[in-house]
Regions:
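Short, acidic loop-to-helix structural element flanking the phosphoryl-transfer center
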Residues: 78-106, 112-116, 144
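Residue-level detector of short coil/turn "hinge" positions at structural boundaries
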Residues: 37, 63-65, 104, 126, ...
């Protein structure tokens, strides 16, 4: 028997290695809009997770969102093919879950177009056919309603049989708000608040498999 009937995944830093893409995008954005400001790669990696519009409003307060967001979007799309990479064992793990009758899906703060492109780049578009982007849901993570949408889609009613997998504090808060278990991957250079207490800390997909499958 499996511990979960439905496993939902974050995207950036969880099923797709987008760290280099995020860093490169923000370096280019700063060069255009804040040329005197220098951010380290480590600082920029913390921008992975929170809704991008919130990050842009915080980092570029002198520019209206309707100017800075299209600039970010255009720059980032130009970096996808070269800078987004696969993580090891992701596809194999997802296929194993599916073969064991476990349903899988993605909930991300990316918009659906970028999410679909990311899935294609990391060769998961033939594995994941349910992906909720920011434009598919009433509000971005950590608002929990998208998990309710996913449960309804998969006809899952018991929240104790749902696991959300992410890589940062936002993902933990999201799962907690929804009342489902959370697994946090620790392989990225992330910082976690002391309140971040997922059911599972996992260093890779092998450990995730052990948590999900009995």
């Amino acid at each position: 028997m499996n511990n979960y009937d439905l496993v939902l995944f974050d995207m950036d830093g969880t099923i797709a290695n987008t760290d280099a893409m995020i860093v490169e995008t923000f370096h280019r954005l700063y060069k255009l809009y804040k040329p005197t400001v220098v951010r380290s790669d480590a600082e920029l990696l913390y921008f992975s997770g929170p809704p991008i519009k919130e990050t842009l409003k915080h980092e570029f307060p002198d520019y209206p969102l309707d100017e800075i967001f299209p600039a970010y979007r255009d720059i980032s799309r130009g970096t996808y093919e070269d800078f987004i990479k696969e993580f090891p064992l992701v596809k194999e793990t997802l296929l194993s879950f599916i073969n064991k009758g476990i349903k899988v899906g993605v909930i991300t703060n990316k918009n659906s177009s970028n999410a679909d492109l990311t899935l294609k780049i990391v060769h998961l578009d033939d594995v994941i056919d349910y992906c909720l982007g920011s434009d598919d849901v009433p509000a971005s993570k950590p608002d929990p309603r998208s998990i309710d949408m996913a449960m309804k889609h998969f006809n899952i009613v018991d929240k104790s049989k749902v696991l959300y997998v992410g890589d940062n504090t936002i993902d933990y808060v999201f799962a907690s708000n929804a009342g489902v278990d959370c697994a946090i991957l620790t392989w990225g250079p992330r910082g976690f608040t002391k309140e971040t207490k997922p059911k599972y800390w996992v260093k890779d997909y092998k450990e995730l498999m052990d948590a999900v499958v009995r």
